[in-house]
Amino acid sequence: MKKSRCVLLLICIASFLHAQQVQVTPTPDQIKAMTPGWKGERLADGRPKASDRLLERLRNISLEEAWGYLRNKGYQNQFEGDWTIIRPDSVMTGRVVTAQYMPMRPDYDSLIKAKGKGEKRIGNTNSWPIDVLQNGDVYVADSYGKIVDGTLIGDNLGNAIYAHSHRGVIFYGSVRDIEGLEDINGFNGWVKGYDPSYIQQMMLAGINLPIRIGRATVLPGDVVLAKKGGVVFIPAQYLEDLVLNSEFVELRDAFGHQRLREGKYTPGQIDQQWTDDIKKDFLQWINSQKNLPMTKEELDAYMKDRNW
């Protein structure tokens, strides 16, 4: 019995020490364990692979609809506003790659660099998150709001980001070379400021870790909706239902607005629970619409469970 306990203790100690090893990024299995709600396809690094089709449809969803849906699901800390935006009239959606930056601490920075060297990572550590980006990814970094001497990228790294992801960045921090970044066709960024300085006294603490972006908690593989008013980070398992729900609400609103303009119904009739006659009218109106955002099959499946 005593021998068995010793063996068990040694196993526990070994497991603990293994878990405490410095990692630049979690393993795919660790990312899967971090995002258990996602049941679909995953990328090679373990992140949820939200579909490109839903990412495209998400572009047409309002921040308010996305925010409201998530709050109703109990996710009340997924929005951050007050950004400086490179192209404020453009929308960006994508799958999140996270990076955590911290104030420089030489001993830990040395451990991260040694680990990265062993993994054949090259260049400065602020380029490492860029190397893992794939098409459709958005680079999201917490650099603790540092503006002066906190510029995570300039136009060189901006070009590399766009070449990898065809998207842009969301930084709780700053960038430099703003004119050069503006010249990258298709690139966009939501940042907290610009500064001509270069990055100093900062270190990369990890890639694809849970991070904080202002008021929001963000996990690798979340889906981001970034617009003029701010950014919403969506757990991937809710994306499809959020998009369908929001598209349906927009159709319902469009129908209501049209019927109010026509004088067919009063505001009181539209704003309260609909009667069977209004529901029937709405379904007929739906069937007359061209270019619906969802397929007929998706709409039929959604409406089976719809509580009017």
Q: Residue spans of the language-model regions?
A:
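Boundary at the C-terminal end of the N-terminal hydrophobic targeting segment
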Residues: 17-21
